[in-house]
Amino acid sequence: MTGCCDDGPATGPRDLRERLRVVAVRGESLVVAADRASACAACAEAKGCGTRALMSMHRTDLMTIARPAGLIVAPGDEVEVAMSGNNLLAGAGLAYLLPALAFVVALALASGAGLSDGGAALVGGVVLMFSFLPLVLLEAARGCRGRCRCSTCIRGTADDGRRAAFRTGLALAAGLVLAGGVRVLTAPAPDVSETFYVFGTLLEVETHGVPEAQARDAMAVLGAHFRQMHRDWHAWAPGELESLNAAMAAGQSFEVDPGLAKLLQQGRDLACRSEGLFDPAVGGMVEAWGFHADTPPEAIRSDAVVAKLLAGAPKMTDLTITGTTVRSSNPAVQLDLGAYAKGAALDLAEADLTAAGIRDAVLNAGGGVQVLGDHGSRPWRVAIRDPFEWGVVGAVSLRPGEALHTSGNYERYFDRGGIRFSHIIDPRTARPMRGVVSVSVLSDNGALSDAAATALCVAGEEDWPRIAAQMGVRAVLRITDDGSIFATPEMRARLEAVEGGFPAPITVVDLPKDVAIPLCPEG
């Protein structure tokens, strides 16, 4: 195997190896998914390290490494990556030991020179600051990540202890942080875990209590289905949905896969129930604002552009779905399934795992978590991110089959003049939604939770309880841009305080009991 560092081949007993999934191939570089060991999170929980530590430990990040000449690899493959244990120890020393040692020595020398306590503290602070310079220089030279190398695609299993140590090293190197709206808190070491790259995000699946061969077979099925979803449901990449959008813009009907037809019908029904606040037909508005691209936009759209978007008036009820044939009466309709595709993907993944005989698993897609069964004697415990601070609002223990999805303005956005413009577009104004920072929805269906979270971000203060009731969701947490927190009685009863309490008082809002469910016109 090719050496990973400056000190020779990666074959010694101190070398750490890990099997990582390739999410992209960029010339002579590979983008791989690297996560911190679940065992670390379990240890942190047991020792009371705190929720923030747990959440920063248990997540996945992307890392770029060099691709050896001649290595043939494609997204979805797995590669063996090695890191020298010596380099890991050196990085830990630079990060933790050198600053502490430099500070203590500086204080001792300053005191010996007769400086006052204030002067000694000042000298120690300056020395402490400069003691981080070697670590900064190391990172500028790509740090530990630049010392990782891979040589071959594999399908084997690495030694558990060295896998855990390697993940810890990658976490140190990559500076992992909290991402997404929800995060699994209770995380014992999984029997089998896989990370997939779907819809521009990392989707983690962990199974428990089944033989590894059975779990690996199930993961292979999931991987194939996720790749198909990513290809067929992407609005701005070659695939079935892009072809459908082109056909509708030309006034033509289009034959789609039965799975996509079912998803579009579900989206149409949810759009009607939300009174159009959730509407996948506004992909043209998303594209006009630039949120379809990988990089965030930089400019506010003019009133003329917005007026043109509104004049098109695209909506899901413009669609007619007959079996697997789809057509639109409005050429302005451009479908973007991003507001509920992750939830729908988790629903399908849950069905795949159940069909494979797997009873206990957790699926984590950044802003959404869905669970099967539990992880022993305890339910899966999930944190809801505080959109204002580094921490969480609270935690929810999920029951088997439940899904918790969060949407908000804190992930994809740009700022102009102190105003945040998010990727969630209000179909009524053709502009990014305002006034709400995040909404979390708990239900027994991933697509419903995902879509409702988007709709309730857009809904106004007076309308959101009615919209929630119409969409059939009862457990909702809503945070506005002034920091106010609102929860339905069902969500308030499930929400658990962490880290000493909630970040703000929670106002309980009752949902109306008798609401008329809007019906979609036939089509």
Swiss-Prot record:
UniProt subcellular location: Cell membrane
This enzyme's EC code(s): 2.7.1.180
Binding site for Mg(2+): 339, 450, 454
Key words, A-Z: Cell membrane, FAD, Flavoprotein, Magnesium, Membrane, Metal-binding, Nitrogen fixation, Transferase, Transmembrane, Transmembrane helix
GO CC terms, sorted: plasma membrane
Gene Ontology biological process: nitrogen fixation
Needed co-factor(s): Mg(2+)
Catalytic reaction list: L-threonyl-[protein] + FAD = FMN-L-threonyl-[protein] + AMP + H(+)
Pfam families listed in its UniProt record: ApbE (PF02424), RseC_MucC (PF04246)
EC primary class: transferase
Residues the record lists as binding FAD: 277-279, 336, 342, 423-425
Spans through the membrane: 88-108, 118-138, 169-189
Lipid bilayer topology: Multi-pass membrane protein
Sample GO molecular function, one term: metal ion binding
Coarse class of the protein's main subcellular location: membrane
Family affiliation: In the N-terminal section; belongs to the RseC family. In the C-terminal section; belongs to the ApbE family.
Protein function: Flavin transferase that catalyzes the transfer of the FMN moiety of FAD and its covalent binding to the hydroxyl group of a threonine residue in a target flavoprotein. Is likely involved in the modification of RnfG and RnfD. Required for nitrogen fixation.
Protein name: FAD:protein FMN transferase
Organism encoding this protein: Rhodobacter capsulatus
Upper lineage: Bacteria, Pseudomonadati, Pseudomonadota, Alphaproteobacteria, Rhodobacterales
